[in-house]
Amino acid sequence: MPVAVESAIPYPTPRKVDLAHHLSTEARIRQPNPIKSVWKAAQVRPGIINMGNGDPHHTLYPISSMNFIVPSLEGDHPVEAWRTGTSKTLVLSSHKDAPSTLSLRTAFAYGAGAGLPAVREALADLGARIHAPPNHTVCLSLGNADALTKCFRLFGDPDDSFLCEEFTFSAMTNAALALGIRWVPVRVDGGGLLPEDLERVMRCWDEKKQGKRPHVLYTVPCSQNPTGSTISLERRRRIYEVAHIYDIIIIEDDPYYFLQYDLQINQNTLKEHGYTRAMSEVLPRSFLSMDIDGRVVRLDSFSKVLAPGIRLGWITSSPFFADKLDMLTDSSTQHPHGLGQAYLAELLGPTGWGADGLMKWVHSLAREYERRRDLFVSVFDAKVAPTGCASAEVPQSGMFVWIQVHLETHPRFVVRTPDSGSDDEGDVLGAVMAAPGVLGEVARGGPITNTEQLMSELLRKLVESGVIMIPASTFAIVDRSGSTLSPIGDRANYLRATFVGTDETIRDGLTIFAQALEEFFNLK
């Protein structure tokens, strides 16, 4: 679906790479839905009489029109105005028998699995302006969870190994386990996935001992869930280079991409070219934007910038992979729901916000979440940091803060020396906390500290105190391939907290958290 638009990012020159060998057995043998194939072929003839499909006739739909009342986007901060009830509104109408961006007779009928053209073209235009992907196409999904599970089926066979961050969103990685896919964790730090560890895993892989070499990397590059880290441009380039060298498909799951903080957009660009161009200059470069091989499958979602219940997102990939995803959708979930597509068509259409209006909303939304992040950090510094029991990285994007609990200062923290199996709190402790990979290499069989036990006790303490955060163990990818140099249990001294709640929730929650830490560490 080529779209000629102006972009702040130069279009890279694609190179022809055959990636068909990455397809799963299911994807290779899947045949197009034969009825859908006939229906698609018929679309080339305008006004054709449809006597083939079993479509309920639009005159019998019990609906004639819908109105969507949305913010008008007047003023510099529309999200603040909408939140406080001072915003003017804009009424978007979608009709069955009157002119609309997307007629309800079309939206509510059976459609193509890839989605209706009005929505796909609007999203392709937006993607071209922000990412400038070479020779890529867009198809719709029912949100990123749907898109990701379809990608697992597209690329994964039983006993395949996929790569991911060592702490990641377990609800999604668990979906792959049911397909017989095994996860290989890659180390992370405050800046996200470490390209040198990715390269080490691939370089040292022994197919005789470990099975087939991993050929897919699943990553959340912006506000990685749960760590909140964002991968820098330099790291992205190095990761893509490793992917090219070792022939890895990159699934770029980026639902928090538009929630970037501390951005300084160019006011001259904003005045001359609008929000989309101004935002494209300061948003992080995606893996998609540098994909000259066609090995990136990017997943975007409206869940974080509009509402999660909309259950609509979009997948950007090479036409080859898009065609395979289309066949999978036509034989499974079918087309995305018409109500959501009608809403998006009007919102992004000529009488609605358009792409530029969406970017204005996104910029304003990020400012509001940035305010809440700053409040979280301020309260954390005032209440939690003075205890000395925990610290936190300030996230650049997204909704999460990754809190490190300093268990090394807990009176019951112990380290089992690898040679004797005894407990020792001496010099070994310093070695574990400073460089867990060095000591952990001796103890690949399992954790050498009681981190998991203490974190479990802390979680119970938090619940009893009236606050809940998600422990790192929930997101930990246990290495069963033998690639990891140190047990992840010894690095699971973290909690994931969110700052998307109300100001009162943030203040009260962190106050309780600080008190619970003091009691847990026997400081009170």
From Swiss-Prot:
EC number(s) given by UniProt: 2.6.1.5
InterPro entries in UniProt: Aminotransferase_I/II_large, Class-I_PLP-dep_aminotransf, PyrdxlP-dep_Trfase, PyrdxlP-dep_Trfase_major
The protein's required cofactors: pyridoxal 5'-phosphate
Record protein name field: L-tyrosine:2-oxoglutarate aminotransferase atrD
Its job: The L-tyrosine:2-oxoglutarate aminotransferase atrD and the atromentin synthetase atrA catalyze consecutive steps to turn over L-tyrosine into atromentin, which represents the generic precursor molecule for the entire terphenylquinone and pulvinic acid family of pigments, which are widely distributed secondary metabolites in homobasidiomycetes. The first step is catalyzed by atrD which converts L-tyrosine in to 4-hydroxyphenylpyruvate (4-HPP).
GO molecular function: L-tyrosine-2-oxoglutarate transaminase activity; pyridoxal phosphate binding
Organism: Tapinella panuoides
Family, per entry: Belongs to the class-I pyridoxal-phosphate-dependent aminotransferase family.
Activity sensitivity to pH: Optimum pH is 9.0.
Usage in biotechnology: Atromentin has been shown to induce caspase-3 and poly (ADP-ribose) polymerase (PARP) in human leukemia U937 cells. It also has anticoagulant activity. Moreover, atromentin has antimicrobial activity. It acts especially as an inhibitor of FabK, the enoyl-acyl carrier protein (ACP) reductase of S.pneumoniae.
Keyword tRNA-binding set for record: no
Any Gene Ontology biological process: biosynthetic process
Temperature-related properties: Optimum temperature is 37 degrees Celsius.
Pathway as given in its UniProt record: Secondary metabolite biosynthesis
Reactions catalysed: L-tyrosine + 2-oxoglutarate = 3-(4-hydroxyphenyl)pyruvate + L-glutamate
Keywords assigned by UniProt, alphabetized: Aminotransferase, Pyridoxal phosphate, Transferase
